[in-house]
């Protein structure tokens, strides 16, 4: 066994809840293709958010500049022994994660989130996130 503070995330105050719909066939997130001029998520440093990620097909999902624990996969709570910090998760159908924002970013140096599959990322399955 190893020591981690990941378990404490389950008791965190949730600043916001967001839902993301991944259309794997068309490379879209929430029916939108990546636009480098559009900020998709604005979050605050030091907060925790619940992200619910639904996918049309199994796909990897990653977040830059933040870490998270998986709360549930396909509506089944994750066992306490599986709680660990992650930056990428495999989404079969639905994943619920608790995202902790500790690193700031800006309009000139934003973070990206979205598909960890590079072909899907090239199709536009990415979003821009600013953390301040």
What do the PLM-derived regions correspond to, one by one?
Residues 1-104, 117:
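Edge beta-strand plus adjacent loop/short-helix module at the start
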Residues 106-119:
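Short, surface-exposed ligand- or partner-binding patches at beta-edge/loop junctions that are enriched
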Residues 123-126:
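Extracellular and select intracellular beta-sandwich modules with Ser/Thr-enriched
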Residues 129-131:
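Interdomain boundary/hinge segments at the C-termini of tandem beta-sandwich modules
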């Amino acid at each position: 066994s190893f020591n981690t503070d990941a378990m404490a995330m389950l008791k965190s105050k949730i600043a916001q809840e967001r839902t993301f719909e991944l259309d794997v066939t068309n490379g879209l997130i929430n029916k939108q293709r990546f636009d480098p001029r559009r900020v998709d998520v604005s979050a605050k440093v030091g907060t925790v958010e619940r992200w619910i990620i639904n996918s049309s097909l199994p796909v990897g999902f990653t977040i830059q500049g933040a870490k998270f624990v998986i709360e549930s996969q396909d509506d089944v709570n994750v066992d306490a022994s599986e709680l660990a910090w992650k930056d990428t998760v495999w989404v079969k159908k639905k994943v619920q994660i608790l995202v902790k924002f500790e690193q700031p970013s800006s309009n000139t140096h934003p973070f990206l989130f979205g598909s960890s599959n590079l072909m899907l990322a090239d199709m536009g399955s990415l979003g821009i996130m600013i953390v301040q």
